Every structure is written in structure tokens, then in C-alpha cells.
Swiss-Prot record:
It comes from the Eukaryota. This is Choline kinase A2. GO terms for cellular component: cytoplasm. One of its GO terms (molecular function) is ATP binding. The keyword Nucleotidyltransferase does not apply. Gene3D superfamilies: 3.90.1200.10, Phosphorylase Kinase, domain 1. Optimum pH is 10. Inhibited by Ca(2+). Mild inhibition by high levels of Mg(2+)(>10 mM). CDD domains: ChoK_euk (cd05156). Homodimer. A small proportion exists as higher oligomers.
Length: 429
């Protein structure tokens, strides 16, 4: 994170001390890990790459100790796990011949980021991850290094694009989002993350492509192409309109897509299954107050999380109903705009959201839910612009096999298609 951002962030001493206790490896010490992965054939067995295995072993030995310090390389197994679009995931595990000596885990998740926000957002993300871990709302954090981290491996599977729109799953997601929005997190609370991130990304993009380079857009959006200067002007237009929004500012996930919503298996490590007494008490910081007979859902990957207008979280999630990332052929995603939720589906989501937060009278729920629909829709183009610019930059940064160029252009096309909704940002009361 930049020194300017660190100096103005306000941290609770106990939370910050907990994050500080994690060994933060010196800047650049393990930067070679990212360089190595950038040149790696994604279909290659990670165990056949000695340099990768050695670096993973070094990280596990330093952060985990115990058997991880003594296990020979041939008894350390590494396998790549399908993960997010801006990181690479590896499951590291000890062989049965080298069981844990103390309380160290026998398997961990190694996450390496190719996210343009990693350097500027590192302190905030570390605090967020540590806080969620300590409150049993997320995996345990074992270590942080420049460009990645070691975390608890939770046997689970992500929801599919189809599943997040199912009524019973959408109800659970709404309840979890309600609790996320009630969290008090010791980070900067001004809702300026979106525009500041976009400004950083555009600066990076300008440094990697020719200033006159034009990105062709699909014909139906009405804008044939854009360059970096055009995008910078659109950002200022967005900034001016977003600043008028009356949507409440809360702690937001900012990336509630299918891959970041997990359905854990029966044994779920650090994720706490709430008791009936927990539900009755309605603890403000619990992510998962729900019927214990129901399957749990866990929100992960808070790498883009910040204080933000809550309507962005809603709009962004509803857009994800339309984007399927589980596609085996290039560009490895499919956008079906007709799957955007109908008005009654959004109303049902918001009814569950408001009930879970518990501060709205029953006779006011429907009207408040209607208001939330109107609060949310103007942020649809904001989400498209945010991830559109992100996609164009990922072309230059990420080795993950995904059609980032197509994705960026498609999202920008949808931004221009829905741009007129921005005029309603100031009208929500």
C-alpha cells in the first residue's frame, strides 16, 4: 500500500497488532515466485518444476515450521487448484511419511496474486483477512509474503453461475451480504476505493500500451473504440456522478461472483457453525446466522474489499448472475445479459437482506426493498467500467488462462450501453 494510504488509515490497535504478528516477508524477497509462474505452462505438473517446489517449500518451512522444516522435497506434494482470475492457487501437502509434529496443518493453500491492487492494498487486505479469520468467518491466515499468502485449505466447492441465482441460494447470499455490510473493519472508511483503483490501473495501462492504441468494442454499444485518454475522461465523468450518490457507505466485498462464494464440505476448519443461541443473540459481526440444517456458504477473496457504497456490491453481484466463468473454451466465459435478475428477484433478495440486518419494521420491508432496487441500478455501469478497465490491464499482468482482452472490451461495451443510468445516482433518497 502506498505511504499516503497507510498514513491516513485508522486501525484498531488489537486488530492491527494481530495482523502485525504475521511474518511479513521483506518486499521483493519472493518476487521471483511470480516471475516463475508467469513463464510456466499452466498444464505442467507443479511437482516437475524444481524451482517452484523449492520456493513453496521455503515459504511453508518459514511460516509453518514443524514437519514443514524437515520434509524433503520428494515428500512435499504440490497441485494447482482452479481459482480466481487474478491469482494462482496451489495445494501444498505433506506426505503420510512426514505427519505434523505439533499443531501445524498437513496441507495449506498457497495463493500467488497477479492482481494490480496487491501492492497498494496489501496492508488493508492483510488486516481484513486476519480479522475475518479471528472471527471464524474465513480461513486461518498462516503467512503473508510479497505477492501472496499461505492460508488454511478448506475442502469446498464454489457455486456455479446458475446456482447463485437459485431462490434458496440467493436468500443465503443476501443474508451473508447483510452481515458483511454490518462489519466494523479498521481500514479507511471514505468510499473512494473504486475511483482510486481505476486511476492506478489506467496509469499502469497507459505505461504498457501505446498512447494512441485503440481498444475495439462490440458494435452494439454505440462506441466503436476507446483509448486510454478516452477511459481517463470516462473515469472523471464517473467520479463526478458517484460523488453524488446517497447510497450508504458500508464495508463491501466488491467482488461477489460465483467463484468467491464457497459451499464447504462437512469438515470446514476455521469456519464456525453457529449454534441456535448464536442465532437468537443475532450477533452483529456473525456472517452466518442461519438454520443449522442448511448448508453453509462462505464468502472468500476479499482482495478488492473496501468501504464503499453498498449499492455497488448489490449491482456487481446481480451482474454476476449473467456471467458464467465455467466455460472450457476461449475466451472461458459467457455473458448472458438476459439472466440479470427480474424486479421481483431483486425485491426478494433485498427483503432477506433487510430482515437479516434486523433494523427495519416488517410493515416497511417491501417499500425499503423497492427503494434498494432503485438505489442499486445506477451502479450497474459503474461495475462494468471497473471490471472493464481491470480486464484490459490483466492482459498485461496475468498468466492465468483467460480471455482478459475480450472480457475487458465486453464489460466496457456494457458500461456504454448502460451509461445513462448514472444520471440517477443523485436521485436516490
Amino acid at each position: 500500500m502506498s505511504s499516503r494510504k497507510v498514513s491516513r488509515a485508522h486501525y484498531d490497535e488489537d486488530e492491527l497488532a494481530s495482523a502485525a504478528n504475521m511474518s511479513l516477508v521483506a518486499e521483493g524477497h519472493f518476487r521471483g515466485m511470480k516471475e516463475l509462474l508467469s513463464t510456466m505452462d499452466l498444464d505442467t505438473d507443479a511437482n516437475t518444476i524444481p524451482e517452484l517446489k523449492e520456493r513453496a517449500h521455503m515459504l511453508c518451512a518459514r511460516f509453518l515450521g514443524g514437519a514443514w522444516k524437515t520434509v524433503p522435497l520428494e515428500h512435499l506434494r504440490i497441485s494447482r487448484i482452479k481459482g480466481g482470475m487474478s491469482n494462482m492457487l496451489f495445494l501444498c501437502r505433506l506426505s503420510e511419511v512426514y505427519p505434523p509434529i505439533r499443531n501445524e496443518p498437513n496441507k495449506v493453500l498457497l495463493r500467488v496474486y497477479f492482481n494490480p491492487e496487491t501492492e497498494s492494498h496489501l496492508v488493508a487486505e492483510s488486516v481484513i483477512f486476519t480479522l475475518l479469520s479471528e472471527r471464524h468467518l474465513g480461513p486461518k491466515l498462516y503467512g503473508i509474503f510479497s505477492g501472496g499468502r499461505l492460508e488454511e485449505y478448506i475442502p469446498s466447492r464454489p457455486l456455479s453461475c446458475h446456482e447463485i441465482s437459485l431462490a434458496h441460494m440467493s436468500t443465503k447470499i443476501a443474508k451473508r451480504v447483510a452481515k458483511v455490510h454490518q462489519l466494523e473493519v479498521p481500514i479507511w472508511k471514505e468510499p473512494d476505493y473504486l475511483c482510486e483503483a481505476l486511476q492506478r490501473w489506467l496509469k499502469q495501462l497507459t505505461g504498457t500500451v501505446d498512447a494512441e492504441h485503440r481498444f475495439d468494442l462490440p458494435e452494439e454499444c454505440g462506441v466503436s473504440s476507446v483509448n486510454c485518454l478516452d477511459l481517463a475522461r470516462e473515469l472523471e465523468f464517473l467520479r463526478a456522478h458517484i460523488s453524488l450518490s446517497k447510497s450508504p457507505v458500508t464495508f463491501c466485498h466488491n467482488d461477489l461472483q460465483e467463484g468467491n462464494i464457497l459451499l464447504p464440505k462437512a469438515s470446514s476448519g476455521n469456519i464456525r457453525m453457529p449454534s441456535l443461541s448464536d442465532e437468537t443473540q443475532a450477533l452483529g459481526n456473525s456472517l452466518s446466522a442461519f438454520n443449522p440444517a442448511d448448508p453453509r456458504l462462505v464468502l472468500i477473496d476479499f482482495e478488492y474489499a473496501s468501504y464503499n457504497y453498498r449499492a455497488f456490491d448489490f449491482a456487481n453481484h446481480f451482474i454476476e448472475w449473467t456471467i458464467d466463468y465455467d466455460i472450457d473454451e476461449a475466451p472461458f466465459y459467457k455473458i448472458q445479459t438476459e439472466n440479470f435478475p427480474e424486479n421481483d428477484q431483486m425485491l426478494e433478495f433485498f427483503l432477506n437482506y433487510l430482515r437479516e440486518q434486523g433494523n427495519t419494521r416488517e410493515n416497511e420491508l417491501y417499500k425499503k426493498s423497492e427503494d434498494l432496487v432503485q438505489e442499486t441500478l445506477p451502479f450497474v455501469p459503474v461495475s462494468h467500467f471497473f471490471w472493464g478497465v481491470w480486464g484490459l490491464l490483466q492482459v498485461e499482468l496475468s498468466p492465468v488462462g483467460f480471455g482478459f482482452a475480450d472480457y475487458g472490451r465486453d464489460r466496457l461495451s456494457l458500461y456504454f450501453k448502460h451509461k445513462q443510468l448514472l444520471k440517477n445516482l443523485a436521485s436516490h433518497q
